[in-house]
UniProtKB/Swiss-Prot annotation:
Molecular-function GO term, any one: 4 iron, 4 sulfur cluster binding
Protein name stated in the entry: 23S rRNA (uracil(1939)-C(5))-methyltransferase RlmD
General function of this protein: Catalyzes the formation of 5-methyl-uridine at position 1939 (m5U1939) in 23S rRNA.
Organism from which the protein derives: Methylococcus capsulatus (strain ATCC 33009 / NCIMB 11132 / Bath)
InterPro entries, alphabetized: 23S_rRNA_MeTrfase_RlmD (IPR001566), MeTrfase_TrmA_AS (IPR030390), MeTrfase_TrmA_CS (IPR030391), NA-bd_OB-fold (IPR012340), SAM-dependent_MTases_sf (IPR029063), TRAM_dom (IPR002792), U5_MeTrfase_fam (IPR010280)
E.C. number(s) listed in UniProt: 2.1.1.190
Residues annotated as binding S-adenosyl-L-methionine: 276, 305, 310, 326, 353, 374
NCBIfam families: PRK13168.1, rumA
Residue ranges of domain TRAM in the record: 8-66
Similarity field: Belongs to the class I-like SAM-binding methyltransferase superfamily. RNA M5U methyltransferase family. RlmD subfamily.
Domain of life: Bacteria
Amino acid sequence: MGHRGKRKPLPAEPIAAHIESFAHDGKGIAHVDGRVVFVDGALPGEDVTFVYTEIKRDYAAGRVVEIVTASPDRVPARCRHFALCGGCSLQYLSEDAQIALKEDLLLDQFRRIGKVEPAAQFPPLRGPHWGYRSRARLGARYVAKKGRELVGFREHASAKIVDMTDCPVLHPALGERIQAFAELIEGLSLRERLPQIEAAVGEERTALVFRVLEDPTAEDFARLARFGKDQGLDVYIQREGRDSVAPVYPETAHDLSYSLPEWEVTFRFGPLDFTQVNMAINRQMIDQVMQALDPQPEERVLDLFCGLGNFTLPLARRAGHVTGVEGGAEAVARAIRNAADNGIGNVEFHVADLSKPESCGSWAGREYHKVLLDPSRSGALEILQCVPNWKAGRIVYVSCNPSTLARDAGILVHEYGYRLLKAGVMDMFPHTAHVESIAVFER
């Protein structure tokens, strides 16, 4: 019988290495014994010792044991939970160096994947590095060995929940209440049947949706309602899918909201609706998109992956007509209500699966002066086949994944004759390697 499936034990002794550069996820890259090693916790230019966490034929992974020679960009991590928590990965890197890393990653992806280069770069959009995150999914677990409830993010590469008391990157309405959330759940009968909390902060209200795997008791409901009242929070429970979300306190559900005063728009949204997590950057991002697209009163604009209208409604304040398209019917219904609430009539919205252009409606065959794309991480590959129909002179692409942006940029440039005029990063997620970016194409 063979020994297939048996793994050699990883070397236990720390190994010396010089860190040469960054990987796309913010890990340091070194070469040891002819193999690329991705070292978690290491910065370019540093001499470190590390231990292996994984060894494959072509590459390996490891984590830092000791920083022998530190980078001048290294700073002390502010959060006491940083070493364990998977919510952040770059707190030990200075703020300026984080921005530079993201700019380098974006340009590298353009060159390697899209074989394109922007003619110019936008200055990076920057905002608060702490207390910025207004939406989060927090894990919850009662740990019998500890005799208490844990609430927070997962540990690095683990399903375990970090034993945390606070979180400095979360909005204070959430980050300063982590311990209070844990104490609340600890007192519920279903504490072992409550795996997560969806939390969302609006300008006037903060909402918590407790995911429960069994129905709460009358005493549980009373505790949840009392907590909501005492803390000034909207409290919901979710037994199954989104349709099962029900208010506990207040007894009637209330929308959350955020406003864009410059564009005279206020958005209302539910606690499970998708919104950008960083409202300061969101406002700057909208301003930058408006400047880049420069919609005119006589122009028709197409806004794809429009969500609840985050870009659509500001665009409609300047353009002649805006068509918004989104895959989720609930988001489109919300966008229609937001347009009506803001007295905006020069818009239309459609529900369409943008990964299946053949099923899209008549809007996909129309001509538009300008187009905005804001897809998910998978990018806009499929819908790009409709680009010739639109005959747009300018396309602005907002991306949360530089690799799919680079792929799609290559298509726009090499297949459809656009020029990549300008690109830049937006620091939507400080202290992480997540890169939010914008690119402007013209022909």
